[in-house]
Amino acid sequence: MNKQKGITDMGVKFDRLVYGGDYNPDQWLEYPDILEEDIRLMKKAHVNTVSLGIFAWAKLEPQEGVYDFDWMEEIINRLYENGISVFLATPSGARPHWLADRYPEVLRVNEMRQRNIFGQRHNHCYTSPIYRQKVRQINMKLAERFDHHPGVLMWHISNEYGGECHCPLCQSAFRSWLKKRYNNDIKEVNRKWNTAFWSHDYQNFDQIESPTPLGETSIHGLVLDWKRFVSHQSVDFCKAEIQALRDAGGTKPATTNLMYNFPTINYHEMAKVLDVVSWDNYPQWHKGPERLIAMDNGMQHDIMRTLKKEPFILMESCRDRQTGSLSAN
């Protein structure tokens, strides 16, 4: 069996404990003195690495096709001059307003078949060709500009992949996925899903819809295959993001920050498209028996270690879930 590429194969040499966290200077660009004070405090705290640009799409591309990377380069330069490296993010984790306004198909549709309006964070369709195109474009631009920079240590792909979309594009993709899985044989679908129960047999693939309280949720095979499909779309989206970097000449290793046992992603499949596994650990202390919370977090570390059977990166953490929620809001 071929060994998956991992952190030891990609030339990532950590000659020190990589220590830091997310840094979002795009939120206060009008106050340049903050950067200098932040750098002073980072050095005092022995921070040597930050994740940069995770939610910066609106600043990187304020208008469609109009890119502004100068501020990012200045920040990377100043950090590097002070011994601070960067995990540079692709910004697909939160889209700009102009993208949703002009291309509403990028917004998710919930299980009740209602399309979301602009807002929140994970509110984008992984199937949407427009969203994939726009993400590919900005990823390639970022790779062309920054992959060669000595201060950029790795690529941080998006942020905490998760969630699902029930839009017409996803319904069509789901049916295509089912046709491939079941050799275009609707009778095989009925047999595997045991749809004869309650007389729920399908006559053709066009009748199949994703699980919804408005319709079907009782067929376990449908629910399970939908989860498999959503995981497939999420992993494929991440793979496409990384491919955009590679197509633009990017050679730096790529990771994405996983997050506990998200039910919509098979992390073993996600790990196959990553060079390095990383995850976000936010223990929810004081919400139950602390022994069990500690055991669960220990188990999560074990799971992350087994995904590639190599060292992993703890990308985010916090003293408690409440602090994390406050910092996010």
Locations of the language-model features?
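Boundary/entry segment of secreted carbohydrate-active catalytic domains
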Residues: 9-31
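Aromatic-lined substrate-binding rim segments of carbohydrate-active enzymes
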Residues: 35-116, 140-143, 235, 239-249
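Short, well-ordered coil/turn segments that N-cap beta-strands
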Residues: 14-19, 46-48, 80-86, 148-153, ...
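Short, solvent-exposed turn/loop segments enriched in Gly/Ser/Thr/Pro and often Arg
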Residues: 24-25, 51-56, 89-98, 153-162, ...
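Acidic-and-aromatic substrate-binding clefts and catalytic sites of carbohydrate-active enzymes
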Residues: 24-34, 58-70, 97, 163, ...
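Alpha-helical scaffolding within the catalytic cores
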Residues: 4-7, 33-40, 74, 141-142, ...
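Polysaccharide-binding and catalytic clefts of secreted carbohydrate-active enzymes
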Residues: 112-274, 280-296
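Active-site clefts of carbohydrate-active enzymes
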Residues: 209-227, 281-282, 300-329
